């Protein structure tokens, strides 16, 4: 006798609405996904994977990141060891142009198509903008790779400059839900982040705008964030999981439960069926090797390889080998410069 397979109404709804019609789940529907019991998780991940394959394709985008300026940031993002306001071991460091070119070459050698230049700042000053301009020029001369930037909040003039220099994609994360944001950042507002995101999109750059999960937000706030990101329609959403850093206000926050993280991955994919959903920081601790594999079979279709800004990531070879094992091709470079 064939055992009966239990089905959950929200997953049946998602199959019709998201998989077949390509319409993302609403905030209330996402809460239902995030509240699914553990026994429903395999079905949720399988459905999210089917959505990814149908609406995004089978290939996986690989990216590397490097920090041009580390530490000394004047903002008080409670999760970040680069804030100059906290007693963190991270100290201010600048990379010179040859080091950036070297990092871009190493990133390209992994098969990555995207290289992101990141700075720990509220927003870039003239010195930083000049450094970025020269770095972009040198990298374009020597490396065949798309260049992205993450330099904090921008003015319209800075947005226009970056677009003019050929920046392919700009990262500016919402991090968390609007309702939870004041509990983790007080030195700038949610609206200021949204303003930069809107200018980036209007200038024709691809917007990368993501989440940092596991900071103490509720399931409803995770759903709120996913819905807010879906409304923003970014090209890419990186999913970070809190890795509590010494000296920060969140240093004693426990790690997010791995199954909750996988539920979130499925939910974000069901909210945004056509968006690039990228594994970013913290997955090594929150999910480990097995969880990383499950996420790639549960909606993820992009990865950051190598190390992050102030923490160690999985070796690039481990992620690339996993993609081979899963028979997932790496997305080929399509230069936009």
Curated annotation (Swiss-Prot):
[4Fe-4S] cluster binds at residues 73, 77, 80. [2Fe-2S] cluster binds at residues 116, 149, 208, 278. Binds 1 [4Fe-4S] cluster. The cluster is coordinated with 3 cysteines and an exchangeable S-adenosyl-L-methionine. GO terms for molecular function: 2 iron, 2 sulfur cluster binding; 4 iron, 4 sulfur cluster binding; biotin synthase activity; iron ion binding. Pathway: Cofactor biosynthesis; biotin biosynthesis; biotin from 7,8-diaminononanoate: step 2/2. It comes from the Bacteria. Its EC number is 2.8.1.6. Its cofactor is [4Fe-4S] cluster; [2Fe-2S] cluster. Residues 58-283 form the Radical SAM core domain. Belongs to the radical SAM superfamily. Biotin synthase family. It catalyses: (4R,5S)-dethiobiotin + (sulfur carrier)-SH + 2 reduced [2Fe-2S]-[ferredoxin] + 2 S-adenosyl-L-methionine = (sulfur carrier)-H + biotin + 2 5'-deoxyadenosine + 2 L-methionine + 2 oxidized [2Fe-2S]-[ferredoxin]. One of its GO terms (biological process) is biotin biosynthetic process. Catalyzes the conversion of dethiobiotin (DTB) to biotin by the insertion of a sulfur atom into dethiobiotin via a radical-based mechanism. Keywords: 2Fe-2S, 4Fe-4S, Biotin biosynthesis, Iron, Iron-sulfur, Metal-binding, S-adenosyl-L-methionine, Transferase. SMART domains: BATS (SM00876), Elp3 (SM00729). InterPro entries: Aldolase_TIM, BATS_dom, Biotin_synth/BioAB, Biotin_synthase, Elp3/MiaA/NifB-like_rSAM, rSAM. Homodimer. This is Biotin synthase. It holds the Pfam family BATS.
